[in-house]
Every structure is written in structure tokens, then in C-alpha cells.
Design a protein with these regions (language model features):
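Two-component/phosphorelay signaling modules centered on CheY-like receiver
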Residues: 15-33, 126
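Residue-level signal for the "D+5" position in two-component response regulator receiver
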Residues: 34, 59-62
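Acidic catalytic/metal-coordinating carboxylates
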Residues: 37-40, 63-69
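Active-site beta3 strand of CheY-like receiver
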Residues: 48-54, 59
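The feature encodes the CheY-like receiver
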Residues: 60, 69, 78, 90
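Alpha4 helix (beta4-alpha4-beta5 surface) of REC/receiver domains from two-component response regulators
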Residues: 66, 89-108, 121
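Hydrophobic/aromatic residues positioned on beta-strands within the core alpha/beta folds
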Residues: 85-86
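C-terminal output helix
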Residues: 111-123
Length: 129
């Protein structure tokens, strides 16, 4: 089976996290683009048309849910799968978090820190579709 490189946009305000995720995805053979703010994520998604967006819940300027909802309303980006990344905390209301992400149009939600085999499986699911 031939592995063709896909374009993935990582939208996260944490430089260190973006760097770690970028390295992991590049190791899988894919091309990575990055955005640190909600507006930057929208602009890059519209210009590069990635095959997948890894979207943090909290971005400067707007939430990941708001960015996702805007992308899903846009004709040119509505079919790009979005995986919401949320930090796992004991104070987190898991059901509410999942509900908000899915209502915004996200296909999936992953909690940080990622379990790497799960992250790899999610990436493969959306990149092979």
C-alpha cells in the first residue's frame, strides 16, 4: 500500500505542543502546517485545504469550537475533518465538552495528553478516508 503525504493543519496556541505533534505527524510522512490563533487557523484552512485539522479547544481570539463551526459553514472548508484536542482535567465536564465539539461540527475529540497509538489510529482513520 502506497502512503501518500497528506496536509495536516495543527491549530494550537501552545508552541511546544504544536512542535511535538508536528514531529509525530511528520514522522508518519505527512506535511504539517501550523496556526497559533483562531483567525490564523481559518485563514490557513481556507488557503491550504488540509486533509485534516487538529484543533485545540482554546485558541487566541476564539475557541476551537467557534473556529470549527465557522469552517463547517464555509463551502470550501466544510468537508475537512476536524479533531478537537482538549486538555484532560478532573474539573472537565466530559459530556459537555463532547457535546460542544460535535455540535460545532467536529468529527472527533481527543484528550491531552495523547495516547500515541490512539493518536496514530485517529490520524490514519481520517487520512485514509
Amino acid at each position: 500500500m502506497q502512503n501518500t503525504a497528506k496536509k495536516i493543519l495543527i491549530a494550537d496556541s501552545n508552541d511546544a505542543f504544536r512542535g511535538s505533534l508536528r514531529a509525530f505527524i511528520q514522522e508518519m510522512g505527512h506535511e504539517v502546517f501550523e496556526a497559533a490563533t483562531g483567525q490564523e487557523a481559518i485563514e490557513k484552512a481556507c488557503s491550504i485545504h488540509p486533509q485534516l485539522i487538529m484543533m485545540d479547544v482554546r485558541l487566541a481570539g476564539m475557541t476551537g469550537d467557534e473556529v470549527t463551526a465557522r469552517l463547517k459553514r464555509n463551502q470550501s472548508t466544510r468537508n475537512i475533518p476536524v479533531v478537537i484536542n482538549a486538555a484532560w482535567t478532573m474539573a472537565c465536564n466530559v459530556e459537555e465538552r463532547i457535546h460542544r465539539a460535535l455540535n460545532a461540527g467536529a468529527e472527533e475529540i481527543l484528550y491531552k495528553p495523547f495516547h500515541l497509538p490512539m493518536l496514530r489510529a485517529v490520524l490514519r482513520t481520517y487520512l485514509l478516508a
